[in-house]
Amino acid sequence: MAHHDPINLMTPPAGLAQLNERSREIFRQIVESYLATGEPVGSRNISRLIAVPLSPASVRNVMADLEQLGLIYAPHTSAGRLPTEAGLRFFVDALMQVGDMTEAERQSIQSQLAAVGRAQSVEAALDEALTRLSGLTRAAAVVLTAKSNTRLKHIEFVRLEPEQALVVLVGEDGQVENRVLTLPPGVPSSALTEASNFLNARIRGRTLAEARLELETALAQDRAELDQLTQKVIAAGVASWSGGDSDDRQLIVRGHANLLEDLHALDDLERVRRLFDDLETKRGVVDLLGRAESAEGVRIFIGSENKLFSLSGSSTIVSPYSDATGRIVGVLGVIGPTRLNYARVIPTVDYAARLLSRLMGG
């Protein structure tokens, strides 16, 4: 079952431990009503919902205490109450019962991943995992892959035009990456073949970072043995791999449209528009997901805990996945409104990440 460590990025309200059972029950009803409808809930409705018979006036007194603790607040448009982000964090960490996936849901992910896994394409497996995850959680599914950790198996240069070639990098995990390369004038096909042979003799089993270091040394030592144009092809090929940190990681997003469902107000629409913009530009998303790579199990970032980009009003639930050596090679999860169905989403993300690890031999 999924586990999740409390992430104390915000100061927990004082006195939570002193909440009595009646206060917890009223608070739970406010949160569960919010997660179900997105709407504030008033004392009259709560007095009908709770198991213990209490008058609306008594409920209002408890709500005033909860508000004092920073767990709920009154939006200016309503007499009802909504949970604060700190309240949601308290609910997720202390009160929520994490559910379990149905057998049908497990099979839905497992059968599809097994099918693409047989095709030996990591990218296809990631894509399928995201499609299933976004479908089951009704949120946007995201994966961050650490491409720089992929160990190389093979490289090939394919000429596209007289002064342009495609560099095809194949990883040991089956991942394929293509980059377009500008060639020096007058490069013959023999130079492309020689460059491929030179590189393949030295890069197999190395990560991109290791291969770059190895090749810089090898080029300096073996310069006399190589044709000048071949040297230029190799140098250009190595340069094309080192396109900066953003190229070392790949962010894939599926299920954007889920974020447009069930919007309640213009401010919801504005929040989703900002989120789309962040996902499109990768602004902060890569950093946020990267923080989950160092943790075991599911990590949950609620609202403004997503300090790295403008995700207030949104939550992120992510889990790392591993390769055959047990090394974490990426992070899988979902991004959605703060009123995500946490009890359902947490085990789903956990299961998908475990399946992906198994598929990759982890």
UniProtKB/Swiss-Prot annotation:
Molecular functions per Gene Ontology: DNA binding
Lineage: Bacteria, Pseudomonadati, Pseudomonadota, Alphaproteobacteria, Hyphomicrobiales
Similarity comment: family membership: Belongs to the HrcA family.
InterPro entries per the UniProt record, alphabetical: GAF-like_dom_sf (IPR029016), HrcA (IPR002571), HrcA_C (IPR021153), WH-like_DNA-bd_sf (IPR036388), WH_DNA-bd_sf (IPR036390), WHTH_transcript_rep_HrcA_IDD (IPR023120)
Protein name: Heat-inducible transcription repressor HrcA
Reported function: Negative regulator of class I heat shock genes (grpE-dnaK-dnaJ and groELS operons). Prevents heat-shock induction of these operons.
Annotated signal sequence range: none
GO terms classed as biological process: negative regulation of DNA-templated transcription
Keywords annotated in UniProt: Repressor, Stress response, Transcription, Transcription regulation
NCBIfam families, alphabetized: hrcA
Gene that this sequence comes from: hrcA
Top-rank lineage group of the source organism: Bacteria
